[in-house]
Amino acid sequence: MLSFSDILLKLQEFWKNQGCLIVQPYDIPAGAGTFHPATLLRSLDSKPWNVAYVAPSRRPTDGRYGENPNRLGSYYQFQVLIKPSPDNIQELYLRSLEALGLDLKSHDVRFVEDNWESPTLGAWGLGWEVWLDGMEVTQFTYFQQVGGIPCRPVAVEITYGVERLAMYIQSVENIFDILWNDSSNSAPMLYADVHLQSEYEFSKYHFELADTQMIFSLFNQYTQEVKHCLQQKVPLVAYDYTMLASHFFNILDARKAISVAQRQNYILQIRELAKGCATLYKEMEEERTMRREKNKGL
C-alpha cells in the first residue's frame, strides 16, 4: 500500500519522466497550487514551460478544528503545468494514475465538465473535474486567461487532490487515518500525527483569535508595497506581496471581519494587484525575448 509520501514521490517521478521540471513548494501561504509563481506567472511566458511540484495549500475558512474527516484548512495539492498543452495530456494523466498502482479497467474514471475561475487572480480556464468511482480527485484546466491576460499558447494545469487520492488508495474514510510514511524502516505515522494539532490550532486562530485590526493594517501595507514594487519594475517581488495580501484577506474572511459587500471590494483589490503583476511580468518577459532574438542576429 502506498503511503502519502510515496504518492507524492511517485507523482514527481512520473512527471519528471515526462519532461517536467520539478520545483519546490513556494514559501508564502496560498490557497491553491495555481498561486505559485511557477504556474501563475510562468503560464504567461511565450516559450514552453513544463513544471510539477507539491503545493501545500491553506484555506482558513475550510478549517474545522480537526473534527471533520473530509475537510481541512491546510492540505496538499500536486500541481502540473505544461505549456503548450500536449495533445495526449489525458492519456498522460491516466498513466499517472496507473503509476500509483490503480487498475483503471477496474474503476470508473470520468471527466466531468467543470470550467474554472479564480476571481482574485483574474484567471479562468476550460476543463474538467476527474472523478474516480464518483469522487473528485483532480481538476484539469486549460488556461485561457491569467491576470487578465490571454494565455498564448494555452497551458494545461493538472491539480491532484493528494489527500483524496490517498484516502482512496489506502481505503480509509478519515483524512487523519491516512498512513503518512513507509513504515518498513520506521514507526508508522498517520496524517493525524503530522497535522491534527496544527489543524486545531490554526482553526482556533482563524475563527477566534486573529487580531483583525492588525491584519487589516497588514493587508493595507502589503497592497501599498505591491504598488511600490510595480513602480520599481520588480514584478516577482510585487507578486509575493500580492500573495501575502490574499492570504491575510482569507484570514479576515474566516474571522468574519468583512461584510458581504466589502468582500467583493477586497477581491477586486487583489485582482487588480495580480493583474498589475502579470502585466508587468509579461511586458518584461517580452522585452527579454526581443533582446535575445536581437542578440542572436548580431
Curated annotation (Swiss-Prot):
Compartment(s) where it occurs, according to its Swiss-Prot or TrEMBL record: Cytoplasm
One Gene Ontology biological process: glycyl-tRNA aminoacylation
GO molecular function: ATP binding; glycine-tRNA ligase activity
Highest rank taxon of the organism: Bacteria
Main localization, broad class: cytoplasm
EC number: 6.1.1.14
Keyword Glycoprotein assigned: no
A UniProt-annotated Pfam family: tRNA-synt_2e
Catalysed reactions, semicolon-separated: tRNA(Gly) + glycine + ATP = glycyl-tRNA(Gly) + AMP + diphosphate
GO cellular component terms attached to this protein's record: cytosol
Keywords: Aminoacyl-tRNA synthetase, ATP-binding, Cytoplasm, Ligase, Nucleotide-binding, Protein biosynthesis
InterPro entries: aa-tRNA-synth_II/BPL/LPL, Gly-tRNA-synth_heterodimer, Gly-tRNA_ligase_asu
Assembly notes: Tetramer of two alpha and two beta subunits.
Family according to the record: Belongs to the class-II aminoacyl-tRNA synthetase family.
Name of this protein: Glycine--tRNA ligase alpha subunit
Organism for this UniProt entry: Helicobacter hepaticus (strain ATCC 51449 / 3B1)
Higher taxonomy: Bacteria, Pseudomonadati, Campylobacterota, Epsilonproteobacteria, Campylobacterales
Name of the gene this protein is made from: glyQ
